[in-house]
Amino acid sequence: MINISDIPKNPGCYIYKNESGTVIYVGKAKNLKKRVSSYFNKKNHDPKTEKLVKSIYEMEFIVTDNEVEALILENTLIKKYSPKYNIDLKDSKNYAYIYISEENFPRIGISRNKSKKGKFYGPFTSAKERDYVLDVLKKTFKIRSCKNMHKRPCLRHHIKNCTAPCSGDITSKDYLNQIKKAEHILKGNIDSLIHELKNEMNEKSKNLQFEEALLIREEINAIERLKTRQNVKRDVKYNEDVISILEKSGKLHIMVFNVLKGTLFDRKYFEFDYTENFFEEFLIQYYSENDVPSEIIISELPKNLEEDNNEYSSDALLEYLSKKKGSKVAFKIPKQGEKKQLLDLAIKNLEIYVNGNEIKVQSLKNKLMLDKSPNIIECFDISHLSGTSTVGSVVQFRNGKPDKKNYRRFKIKTVSGIDDFKSISEVVFRRYSKLLEENLELPDLIIIDGGKGQLSSAFSELRKLKLKIPLISIAKREEEIYTPGIENPLPIKKNEKASLFIQEIRDEAHRFAINYNRLLRKKELIK
């Protein structure tokens, strides 16, 4: 179930998955909400896109700072997942880099091959964006692009787009200074370059060198138009993890951005109860199962890692991580630059993820007029094929997210043939009698997939167990929501946030039940 209202309007990448959780398509957008909405609101899709839309079961998104970052990240994700529909719809060849050669007077151009000597920046998934950046750099800094330097100036020199090192009109020192400026931009160090150029421009003006000051001003204007350069793809040789941490209501939320060879290629989310030594416990457990990077970027060191004289010093943790990696590992707390931008991006994604789920939970509390927030929600579904292999499922959502360790499947034992009412009665009774017997945590809200009949059956079982847990059901056809003792459905529109959240939970319970049903049928066939 795709809940459009949860999607931000930021630029970023969206990841579509099918019912089995396989990534089937990766896309990028300037406005995530607008782009994803177009898949489900537009009716006249081409056949391939229509087939894609029918296969979409769930979606993830990663927010970026701008559209160029989204372009680069899209390429990274496509290479990682090789999604079915991207392979069909996109050119699978490698994307090109902007290349600066290793010569006395380096040239600038485009290359897909990184084996030759030189410096490479990119890759660029958009040929239009790549060509624009290259064109600006060539014109702004008058860098040559010819493969072999001619003995006399070419047309680019005559239209003032090249300094013509071939003719000896510029010294090697001055030319390499222009190359250095271009490299500053391609590395993302735009602000520092603009600052240097402004100082240089002011100095020229003071010395009454107005023509040269004007040329520098033109350079600054061109550079500022390029200020949205990407910071997700960086031409570096090391790996790093970027870890953002958010504490909320006694819970710790952690998002890890994995950066491989300068490229953001994955993210992972974790949630657990707050403990005093959570950070080192998390790092030890996480890196016991994952590769240790050269750098771990974090917003701040926990207190017990800031001091060397406590029980658990930073030296011990770093020694453990370095030993596992086989080389030195460092914690970094960036205050500015690209790494700070990556950290800010990780924090932004984590806040959107956590707060988005909190908004869903609160909207449900308000619409159902519950006394407390439904932080733990369980949903039941029954699945069968013509009365055979009847199974039940219960899924649990905790703080707005699936909590799969608390999913349960039931073989129906007391019902013959098709009887959804009795089947619901059985699974509800079995589920909550066991929770009561083992003194385990009960949900704040129960959802039944079905109409008033299934709702009544579940309510009867809860009364037998003397449980007073808020209970609703959702009927498939019109997505109507019912509650015990009220004849008419609740006045909640099916496209409201609360209803969409209920539909999301119901769809997950349905998927889980169907998968179990298929498994049992397969076992029956091979007996």
Swiss-Prot record:
One of its GO terms (molecular function) is excinuclease ABC activity. SUPFAM superfamilies: C-terminal UvrC-binding domain of UvrB, GIY-YIG endonuclease. One of its GO terms (biological process) is SOS response. Residues 191-226 form the UVR domain. GO terms for cellular component: cytoplasm; excinuclease repair complex. It is found in: Cytoplasm. InterPro entries: GIY-YIG_endonuc, GIY-YIG_endonuc_sf, GIY-YIG_UvrC_Cho, UVR_dom, UVR_dom_sf, UvrABC_protein_C, UvrC, UvrC_RNase_H_dom. Residues 9-87 form the GIY-YIG domain. It holds the Pfam family UVR. Keywords: Cytoplasm, DNA damage, DNA excision, DNA repair, Excision nuclease, SOS response. Belongs to the UvrC family. Interacts with UvrB in an incision complex. NCBIfam families: uvrC. The UvrABC repair system catalyzes the recognition and processing of DNA lesions. UvrC both incises the 5' and 3' sides of the lesion. The N-terminal half is responsible for the 3' incision and the C-terminal half is responsible for the 5' incision. This is UvrABC system protein C. It comes from Methanococcus maripaludis (strain DSM 14266 / JCM 13030 / NBRC 101832 / S2 / LL). The lineage of its organism: Archaea, Methanobacteriati, Methanobacteriota, Methanomada group, Methanococci. The gene is uvrC.
